[in-house]
């Protein structure tokens, strides 16, 4: 997330590491600043992790053995967040606080010039965009074989944004965009 935020113009990290402690059966975060908190964790054999916050809030995270980032929600300074596991094993976590300024900067960058969708189906997307400042149009579509991109009717080689998404460079002005997907090998 921090790399993506930087690519989108944020000057600060979107997720900042905050101190946490882990021992057998429970990991603890002492909240020192109001904000949204998340946690990444090492592998567990338990399929469920339980969050308990000192304000009385609780939450269960199922399929924990699959591994994902836990959304711990909003917490206030002075709160204590505990993450417990039923197998009574040590689960090392890395806790993060969301930097809202970095999130807002990234959001504004993404939202400042958007494509207006004119049609879509399971294999074709068309739209228009009026570009005020030349840059890259990034799609929330995975960069994989099979996609062909047309800008103003001309086939354009797609680029990759953040090692994951389809992106195409655009000049100032109005553009017609078309993406067509054909299953590779057909």
Predicted feature locations:
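Active-site-proximal, structured, solvent-exposed surfaces of multi-pass membrane proteins
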Residues: 1-186
